[in-house]
């Protein structure tokens, strides 16, 4: 079985794969101080509660937080007796090319989404990921990652309003019934929601115009379902795109005889 780990700035997600079937999926907050022992106790407890008897033989990690990787490596070595693949490291091969400026470092989550998006939808694709940042990743016809856009995340924008303006409260994002708000919370929700709808539409339109070819647009990430309600923005929504990509990258490395 394969344990896939996606460590983001806010949350870390673990998924257990048996072949091409995901049989478990768990989320925790990202904390670099968390030890390998703590990860194992937490994970094994949740597996036991769900009656999952895991025989983990492989592990793959994607992390946008470098400080977390060390203890995840220890988890893999100590408890599963396997050396993990880490996306972005030289020992982890990708099944797609990366065509960006020399010396540029691309976030591993963006590469993983590219792999998964291309496998399912083919090329000429835009992947919009609503995470701590809102990212737009462009996949060429042959599956290559050719760049993208990074914008502030939705919740980050709401928090910035709250912290920078003393009179504005903390609010949760939701789709407002009307554009014109009749109270402060509704005004903030409208500004952020419809502002991001406009941001996504404009950036995707400009990417398509610059690319000069028809492109599919798919969404993923924690807040993607909220914006999926705006039907004309996306062609599809994928709730576990990153985990699908990690499974595919692991499979690719096995196929070429690369066992980290």
Curated annotation (Swiss-Prot):
Catalyzed chemical reaction(s): (R)-pantothenate + ATP = (R)-4'-phosphopantothenate + ADP + H(+)
Example GO biological process: coenzyme A biosynthetic process
Residues at which substrate binds: 107-110, 184
Needed co-factor(s): NH4(+); K(+)
Keywords: ATP-binding, Coenzyme A biosynthesis, Cytoplasm, Kinase, Metal-binding, Nucleotide-binding, Potassium, Transferase
Organism superkingdom: Bacteria
SUPFAM superfamilies to which the protein is assigned, alphabetical: Actin-like ATPase domain (SSF53067)
InterPro entries xref list: ATPase_NBD, Type_III_PanK
Active site: 109 (proton acceptor)
Membrane-spanning parts: none
Subcellular location(s) of the protein: Cytoplasm
Binding site for K(+): 129
Cofactor note: A monovalent cation. Ammonium or potassium.
E.C. number(s) listed in UniProt: 2.7.1.33
Alphabetized GO MF terms: ATP binding; metal ion binding; pantothenate kinase activity
Residue positions binding ATP: 6-13, 132
Main localization (coarse): cytoplasm
PANTHER family: TYPE III PANTOTHENATE KINASE (PTHR34265:SF1)
Subunit annotation: Homodimer.
Similarity-based family: Belongs to the type III pantothenate kinase family.
Official protein name in the record: Type III pantothenate kinase
